[in-house]
Amino acid sequence: MNKKYIIFGATGATGSALVHQLYEEKKACHLIAKNKDELENLSSTYGYSYSICNVLNLNFVDQLVKDLNSIEILGIAYCVGSIDIKPFKSTQAKDFISSYVLNVVSVTEIIKAFQENLKRNNGSVVLFSTVAAKRGFVNHSIISSAKAAIEGLTVSLAAELAPNIRINCIAPSLTKSKISNFLFDNKKNIDVIQNMHPLKRLGEGKDIASLAKFLLSPENSWITGQIIGVDGGRSSVA
């Protein structure tokens, strides 16, 4: 039977690390991202099937249903994200709407579309929040509000979709990635950011992916509705 894990945002730091870790464990995956060249390269490296998709276009679900029609879905990891940092006075309504669609609305459409598939496979869904959803950081109003909504969605769907579908959420702190590189443009910035974390280093995609892999595994089938920090200690002991 064609059983696979579906990885959204597969070409990003966390997504690509998760793909690698699942490959190491000989798990089959279907990769989804919007950058055609990067996605084709990743697919070629691991021999996985893929779909090119921009989740900001809500019509994407219809095509995905066709692409994944023959796949039995063991789990979904929604490793899609953004870094929307600006002073509140500079924000516009479209900033909040775009972030909410990317982080919340799109994943609700995905879960609805594949709910029955996940249910018959006792599947797992892993979502992603941020440490900033619970801690107040300057200039984070856009992303904090969208990710706080993801945390609410996690616990609500965990209750509603039990016992056959597990929903959990990972809340990282700042992680090294293509979209965060602008924050690490000099050593002083790096040192300042590292020192905000008790473990005194920046997070990496593999740090987050390790927990995502754990939560996707059917061996951990008594965990649902959890928001778990992978943040170098920043949320609780910084």
Where are these regions (language model features)?
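N-terminal Rossmann NAD(P)H-binding glycine-rich loop of SDR-like oxidoreductase domains
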Residues: 11, 19
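Catalytic Tyr-X3-Lys loop
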Residues: 82, 89-109, 126, 143, ...
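Alpha-helical segment proximal to the catalytic Tyr-Lys
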Residues: 116, 158-163
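Residue(s) in the substrate-gating loop at a strand-loop-helix junction
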Residues: 130
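Short C-terminal tail/terminal secondary-structure segment
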Residues: 135, 213, 224-238
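Active-site loop-to-helix junction immediately N-terminal to the catalytic Tyr of the SDR YXXXK motif
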Residues: 136-144, 156
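Short, small/polar-rich loop/turn modules that mediate ligand/substrate recognition or access, typified
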Residues: 162-166, 223-225
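A conserved structural motif in NAD(P)-dependent oxidoreductases
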Residues: 197-208
